[in-house]
């Protein structure tokens, strides 16, 4: 059969999409572009916000309208959270975020027998106990591979539905992760990105006293030719022991994405975030103590429920102290089924947007300073694609770098940085 997959959402969804591509192609099926004609269209959904749900519904409806005779299968967090709503959109298969192998078996069976009525196969995510090992790799055309080492989350932030769609923390074993990483190195990748719903919790469900730094050491030693990059982390991960051991790993990329969400302790408490602004700043200080100009990036939610002018001012002051190299800034988006959605003192959208603009202005200044600090330096760059008449890639700190050259796809080169290229760097290959 010919199949196509459309992915919405986070890197974990991207990972699971490439895993499904690997499995289906390995079974003899043909992957096509989503806009092309296919027998089966799989939509891998996201449900992190109400806006995400709407995007998923729109994509399902558009696919149904454009390809009325094709089989349409929907999986992912939106399908996990609202399976009956998805089934009501007249799709053929509805599955959640678990047991991808069984889901793909159903896809194949339904493609052969279109008389089968709509199937809804969604479990209770909170009752999951085992980590589902899927093939690691990269999306077609990508130069870095993703390696999912964890699933689930037990933080229960008041604004988030994901613990209910992904279940409790489940970790991949060190041995299994090392085996997959070695296979990726042999396949020609130069970089792997460790992904998970909450990788800071990796190991808490495994036997023995193991944590994320133990996994990092094992992976970096097992594949010394691969750059190893971390996904999003919680501030609690960044301890003196973590930094001391991590800084001794030459192939660990010095890019640390620490989820902030707010710089006000009062707001953080309402969010049920389990740290203070001062603890977050301590994480930043430790990283800069042990690494040379690490990229410290973050997420920020503006206009959370009950956020006062004073609290937002505290956040602005805090992010300037943290001096992030880049920020992802979002207005708070209500999500049905969460504690925050039921809280009083919801802010108007105009206030949320205004605060986003204020925070973005501060973020732009910090990003500019960080980029300028690299002018005149040499950085190893993994090139990925042609853009703006040049080749574009990323340095270990995940800053985008542009340079001229011949075919540099999936090539690692040293680049002397000569200046800025928008919100990126530009240089010459040495």
Question: What does each model-identified segment do?
Answer:
Residues 73, 81, 186-309, 320:
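Conserved SAM/AdoMet-binding glycine-rich loop
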Residues 258, 299, 319, 327, ...:
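Hydrophobic, well-ordered secondary-structure elements that form the walls
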Residues 342-430:
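Terminal RNA-binding accessory module
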Residues 140-143, 153-155, 252, 262, ...:
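Short flexible coil/turn linkers enriched for glycine and charged/polar residues
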Residues 7, 232, 260-262, 383, ...:
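Flexible glycine-/small-residue-rich
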Residues 47-48, 166-167, 206-209, 269-275, ...:
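Short glycine-enriched, charge-decorated loop/helix-capping segments at active-site entrances
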Residues 1-202, 241, 246, 252, ...:
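Proteins enriched for Cys/Gly/acidic motifs involved in redox and nucleic-acid/cofactor modification
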Residues 1, 29, 70, 92, ...:
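A structural micro-motif
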């Amino acid at each position: 059969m010919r199949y196509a997959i459309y992915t919405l959402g986070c890197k974990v969804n991207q990972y699971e999409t490439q895993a499904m591509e690997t499995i289906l192609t390995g079974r003899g099926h043909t992957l096509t572009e989503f806009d092309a004609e296919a027998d089966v269209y799989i939509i891998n959904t996201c449900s992190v916000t109400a806006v995400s749900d709407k995007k998923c519904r729109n994509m399902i409806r558009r696919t149904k309208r454009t390809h009325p005779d094709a089989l349409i299968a929907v999986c992912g967090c939106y399908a996990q959270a609202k399976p009956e709503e998805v089934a009501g959109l007249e799709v053929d298969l509805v599955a959640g975020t678990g047991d991808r192998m069984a889901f793909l078996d159903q896809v194949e069976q339904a493609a052969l027998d279109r008389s089968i009525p709509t199937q809804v196969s969604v479990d209770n995510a909170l009752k999951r106990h085992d980590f589902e090992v899927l093939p690691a790799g990269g999306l077609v055309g990508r130069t870095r591979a993703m390696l999912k080492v964890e699933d689930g989350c037990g933080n229960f932030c008041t604004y988030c539905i994901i613990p209910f769609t992904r279940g409790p923390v489940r970790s991949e074993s060190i041995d299994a992760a090392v085996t997959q990483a070695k296979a990726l190195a042999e396949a020609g990748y130069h970089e792997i990105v460790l992904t998970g719903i909450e990788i800071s919790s990796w190991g808490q469900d495994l036997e023995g006293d193991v944590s994320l730094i133990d996994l990092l050491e094992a992976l970096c030693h097992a594949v010394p030719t691969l750059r190893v990059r971390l996904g999003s982390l919680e501030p609690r991960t960044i301890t003196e022991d973590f930094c001391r051991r991590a800084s001794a790993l030459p192939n660990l990329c010095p890019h640390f994405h620490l989820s902030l969400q707010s710089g006000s302790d009062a707001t953080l408490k309402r969010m049920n975030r389990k740290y203070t602004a001062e603890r977050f700043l301590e994480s930043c200080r430790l990283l800069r103590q042990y690494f040379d100009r690490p990229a410290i990036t973050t997420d920020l939610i503006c206009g959370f429920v009950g956020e006062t002018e004073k609290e937002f001012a505290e956040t602005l002051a805090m992010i300037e102290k943290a001096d992030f190299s880049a920020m992802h800034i979002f207005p708070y988006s209500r999500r049905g089924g969460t504690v925050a959605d039921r809280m009083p003192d919801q802010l108007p959208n105009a206030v949320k947007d205004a605060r986003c603009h204020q925070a973005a202005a501060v973020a732009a200044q910090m990003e500019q300073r960080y980029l300028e600090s690299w002018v005149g330096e040499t950085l190893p760059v993994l090139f990925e694609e042609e853009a703006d008449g040049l080749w574009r890639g990323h340095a270990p700190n995940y800053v985008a770098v542009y340079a001229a050259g011949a075919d540099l796809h999936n090539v690692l080169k040293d680049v002397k940085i000569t200046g800025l290229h928008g919100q990126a760097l530009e240089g010459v290959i040495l």
